């Protein structure tokens, strides 16, 4: 894209700047549209499981319901509690929303179709995702209310706990791919499973890590059955209790952008990303972005299905799963994978 702007007679600095802005908009704007659509899909899936119709009034089949809800919150008054820390109260949802967008910079949508094709892409995602907890902590502290405060404490402990397990799980992927680059990780999966399947998930050593990563993704995004931060019977609406209008909407958008990101990471890191499921020449005629979107939609359906059907964990069960089950297993698996690669690849 920089070359295109340079061909119009611009200097390299101006061309690079405009190309960067255009790339950001090409990701951010479709992402916002995608978030609106998956909120609609989420509600439709819950309704179908509960034998209801779901959104069906605004637009054909209720497709415009999310946009109507967005317009509603945009027109509402932003109410700030009298005892709240005004500056921190307003900046917390902005942090959550911004961090949710930043991680998409290194996601490959097709071969070479990535905003920032950096060598440490996976490390960048881990670093950026760890910043999301700051928005949650600030919202709980700045609200000056007990329910958001307790929710923020839960959320910070939960996110930090599962980020440790996620880090060790992803080391296994890096060992097999021999790279932190997201494009290279996808390419390393070509024909990996049984010689014909384009996925790390069909590797017997990596399949348990894929399952643990999927469950950890639910915990990292505070989705059911790990939605302890927003347990209605205990904490009202959690750290979002005192928020209204666009501040509340930014939290909502950030949450669903993170859910979409985790679905994408499941597809990219373990199930071939933009590669077709089978390493068969005719399947490569389908654009890679179509395969990636199909996998993302599958994982989003799993997320919604679990949320609608699985009962909520107790807080002690949540912590036990992260620290006493996932962390030891992921550590042991790193040693197993390292030994296997030493004997097969590097011997």
UniProtKB/Swiss-Prot annotation:
Any one GO BP annotation for this protein: aerobic respiration
Topology in membrane: Multi-pass membrane protein
Reaction catalyzed: a quinone + NADH + 5 H(+)(in) = a quinol + NAD(+) + 4 H(+)(out)
Origin superkingdom: Bacteria
UniProt-annotated location(s): Cell inner membrane
EC number(s) recorded for this UniProt protein: 7.1.1.-
Segments crossing the lipid bilayer: 21-41, 87-107, 118-138, 157-177, 195-215, 258-278, 283-303, 323-343
Keyword Zinc included in the entry's annotation: no
Broad enzyme group: translocase
Alphabetic keyword roster: Cell inner membrane, Cell membrane, Membrane, NAD, Quinone, Translocase, Transmembrane, Transmembrane helix, Ubiquinone
Keyword Metal-binding set for record: no
InterPro entries registered for this protein in UniProt: NADH_UbQ_OxRdtase_su1/FPO, NADH_UbQ_OxRdtase_su1_CS
GO molecular function: NADH dehydrogenase activity; oxidoreductase activity, acting on NAD(P)H, quinone or similar compound as acceptor; quinone binding
Main subcellular location: membrane
Gene Ontology CC: plasma membrane
UniProt-listed NCBIfam families: PRK06076.1-2, PRK06076.1-6
Family: Belongs to the complex I subunit 1 family.
Function: NDH-1 shuttles electrons from NADH, via FMN and iron-sulfur (Fe-S) centers, to quinones in the respiratory chain. The immediate electron acceptor for the enzyme in this species is believed to be ubiquinone. Couples the redox reaction to proton translocation (for every two electrons transferred, four hydrogen ions are translocated across the cytoplasmic membrane), and thus conserves the redox energy in a proton gradient. This subunit may bind ubiquinone.
Subunit and partners: NDH-1 is composed of 14 different subunits. Subunits NuoA, H, J, K, L, M, N constitute the membrane sector of the complex.
HAMAP family, sorted: NDH1_NuoH (MF_01350)
Protein name as it appears in the record: NADH-quinone oxidoreductase subunit H
Organism: Sphingopyxis alaskensis (strain DSM 13593 / LMG 18877 / RB2256)
């Amino acid at each position: 894209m920089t070359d295109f702007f340079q061909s119009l007679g611009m200097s390299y600095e101006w061309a690079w700047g405009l190309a960067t802005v255009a790339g950001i908009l090409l990701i951010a704007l479709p992402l916002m549209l995608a978030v609106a659509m998956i909120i609609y899909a989420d509600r439709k899936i819950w309704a179908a499981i509960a034998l209801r119709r779901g959104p069906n009034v605004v637009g054909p089949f209720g497709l415009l319901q999310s946009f109507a809800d967005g317009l509603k919150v945009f027109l509402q008054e932003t109410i700030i509690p009298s005892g709240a820390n005004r500056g921190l109260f307003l900046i917390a949802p902005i942090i959550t929303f911004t961090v949710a967008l930043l991680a998409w910079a290194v996601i490959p949508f097709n071969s070479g179709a990535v905003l920032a094709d950096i060598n440490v892409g996976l490390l960048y995602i881990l670093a950026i995702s760890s910043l999301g907890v700051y928005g949650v902590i600030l919202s709980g502290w700045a609200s000056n209310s007990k329910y958001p405060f307790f929710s923020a404490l839960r959320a910070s402990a939960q996110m930090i706990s599962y980020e440790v397990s996620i880090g060790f799980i992803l080391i296994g992927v890096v060992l097999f791919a021999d790279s932190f680059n997201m494009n290279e990780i996808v390419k390393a999966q070509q024909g990996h499973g049984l010689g014909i399947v384009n996925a790390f998930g069909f590797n017997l050593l990596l399949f348990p890590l894929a399952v643990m990563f999927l469950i950890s993704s639910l915990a990292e995004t505070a989705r059911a059955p790990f939605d302890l931060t927003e347990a209605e019977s205990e904490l009202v609406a959690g750290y979002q209790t005192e928020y209204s209008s666009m501040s509340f909407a930014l939290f909502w958008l950030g949450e669903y952008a993170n859910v979409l990101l985790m679905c994408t990471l499941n597809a990219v890191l373990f199930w071939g990303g933009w590669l077709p499921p089978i390493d068969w020449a005719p399947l490569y005629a389908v654009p890679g972005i179509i395969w990636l979107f199909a996998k993302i939609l599958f994982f989003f359906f799993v997320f919604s299905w679990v949320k609608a059907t699985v009962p909520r964990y107790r807080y002690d069960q949540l912590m036990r799963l992260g620290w006493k089950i996932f962390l030891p297993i992921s550590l042991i698996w790193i040693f197993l994978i390292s030994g296997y690669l030493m004997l097969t690849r590097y011997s």
